[in-house]
Amino acid sequence: MQLLTLPPSPALATSIRATAQVFEDPKSQALLAHLQQVAPSEASVLIIGETGTGKELVARHIHNLSNRRNRPFIAVNCGAFSESLVEAELFGHEKGAFTGALSAKAGWFEEADGGTLFLDEIGDLPMAIQVKLLRVLQEREVVRLGSRKSIPIDVRVLAATNVQLEKAINAGHFREDLYYRLNVVNLELSPLRDRPGDILPLTRHFIEAYSQRLGYGRVTISPGAEHKLRGYSWPGNIRELENVIHHTLLICRNGVIERDDLRLSNLRIDRPDDQHATADDSPEALLERAFQKLFEQQAGALHEKVEDALLRSAYRFCHYNQVHTASLLGLSRNVTRTRLIKIGELAVNKRRPTENLQGERLIQLSI
């Protein structure tokens, strides 16, 4: 386990990402409204989402809306410590409990007493520690390693994972009884690609925050750069966006972030179990991304090129049948035939003059 908020200065005690409560997408607004309802309770919360979607941010928001807001918020990464140290870090240890234990130390549960303990990557906990965690949640007391004395605690537990715990239960890697104990309230965070309305508000937040840290003046972002950010799929979610903006601010000039300043990854992450992946791979989304690449190339006569490509593709899809092609595109056969001749897909019939359709357009595309 690792305490996620390590800087000694209170001003730096949380990451910029962990304070970015600037959501405008309808999905995020609905989630925030739900948080308003569940935060005042003492119920355990299980937060599910891909890496970098803002699970710690949601946990902090719940804490700040609760009656524990003036008490400690402790964030712990359950996968950051070896199995031999997990118990001592979570529950504490007495002097001499193991080699190197030169003094007694309180665990994270004791440190969070009266407040909130956020257990990130809960699915990484070893099974033996899951048993002890379940007992702590049930009895509301901890026993330090090397001690027999129970220490009462008053802690609200929020947990998060980026894996499907139901599958982990079936595979024997996670306890079912612990799952139900943690999953009183279930919050599922959508990936950033499924809430595009958050991209630019988060971008502006990161620009402002990092500009202050770097000692910069006012930094703006060009429309072209905004368009590039909106068109990217963000496999690393909010964490990736934060890193991109941080890097961009280091290399941009004249206080304006331009399209070419943005360095976006070419990495494609396949998520066969992701229910949201199909929406991003819809024909409309694929077509829009293709248009964006054409726009970035700044090629001339785009309208005509798109028309020609559409007609050629439809003609081949219809097995070179003019009538079917015209029907598929919603055009007259004469217009279809004339354009097929123009793009070289159909030979001119010299015995029959081609209709003069000089002023007629194939299709009106708004791109």
From Swiss-Prot:
Q: What does this protein do?
A: Involved in the dimethyl sulfide degradation pathway. Activates the expression of sfnG and sfnF.
Q: Which gene encodes it?
A: sfnR
Q: One biological-process term from Gene Ontology?
A: regulation of DNA-templated transcription
Q: Which SUPFAM superfamilies match?
A: Homeodomain-like, P-loop containing nucleoside triphosphate hydrolases
By what name is this protein known?
A: Sigma54-dependent transcriptional regulator SfnR
Going by the UniProt record, its keywords in alphabetical order are:
Activator, ATP-binding, DNA-binding, Nucleotide-binding, Transcription, Transcription regulation
Q: Name one Pfam family in it.
A: Sigma54_activat
UniProt-listed InterPro entries: AAA+_ATPase, Homeodomain-like_sf, P-loop_NTPase, Sigma_54_int, Sigma_54_int_dom_ATP-bd_1, Sigma_54_int_dom_ATP-bd_2, Sigma_54_int_dom_CS
GO MF terms held by the record: ATP binding; ATP hydrolysis activity; DNA binding
Q: Which residues bind ATP?
A: 49-56, 112-121
The UniProt record lists the Sigma-54 factor interaction domain at 21-250
